[in-house]
C-alpha cells in the first residue's frame, strides 16, 4: 500500500521495550517519550507484524530501548517469523550480544546493527555513563561468528567523537562490517554543542570511493565502497530526500503505530483494538493515511 504521497510501505520498526542498560546522554527514546508500563506480548507483536505484511511490509527491525533486555526476545523473533517477511534485524548497544548471539540466530534473526560511537574505553563510558566497550566489541565479533550478517556498526557522529572515526572505519574494515555514519539530532537545546556537520565527511568519502551505489528503497541513500569498506550516511534532519523516499512505519513498545520518526502527535493505538479482538487492518490504513514527509521539498 502507498501513502497519499506515493510512498510504499516496506518495513516496520518495532520497539519492544523502553528500558536500557546504558544512559547515553543523547538518547531520544525512539522519539516516543513515554513511561507507560503497557508492554506487548510476543504473540501480540507477532500478530501486528504479520498484519503489516498485508500492506507491503517485508522487513522488520527490532529495537528498544535495548531489545536484548527482554528475556523473551527470542520468542518475539519466533513469533515474527513469516514467509512473507524476508528480513528480521535487530538494533542493539551490544552489551548483552555476545551471550545471546547464537540463540538469536537460532530463533530466526537474520542480522544485527550495533551502536558503537568510539573504541576508546574512557570516552565510551563518558557517552554511555557506565558501558564497557570491550563487551560491545566481543558481541560484534560473536555476532559475525554466528552469521548475524551483514552486520552494521552505527556510529553517531558528534563533536566529541568525530576524531575516532578513522579508528572505527579501520575496525569495520578488519571485521567485515558495514559502517553507518549517522547525523546527530540535537533535540534539546543543551545538546546543540555536540552537533557535527557530516556533509564534508561524506564529500571526502565520495571522492575516495571506488564505487557508489544508490539504495532506492532506503531514502535513496548512497552506499560508498572505500578500500573494501561499505559506508552509508544517515541524515534525517532537514532532508527532504530522506522523507520523500521513506518506506518505514514504526510500532512503539506500548503498542502505537507511529507514522513518522520525527512526530509524536499522530500515533495510532493498535494494541487496544488487538486486545478487544478487532481487525487491525483499519488501524494500519489510518496510520498510512496519516503519513506525510516531515521535511518537504521547498
From Swiss-Prot:
SUPFAM superfamilies, per database record: Radical SAM enzymes (SSF102114)
Pfam families in the cross-refs: Fer4_12, Mob_synth_C, Radical_SAM
EC number: 4.1.99.22
GO MF annotations, alphabetized: 4 iron, 4 sulfur cluster binding; cyclic pyranopterin monophosphate synthase activity; GTP 3',8'-cyclase activity; GTP binding; metal ion binding; S-adenosyl-L-methionine binding
Binding site for [4Fe-4S] cluster 2: 243, 246, 260
Cofactor: [4Fe-4S] cluster
NCBIfam families per record: moaA_archaeal, PRK00164.2-1
The protein's name in its UniProt record: Probable GTP 3',8-cyclase
Organism field: Methanocaldococcus jannaschii (strain ATCC 43067 / DSM 2661 / JAL-1 / JCM 10045 / NBRC 100440) (Methanococcus jannaschii)
Record lineage: Archaea, Methanobacteriati, Methanobacteriota, Methanomada group, Methanococci
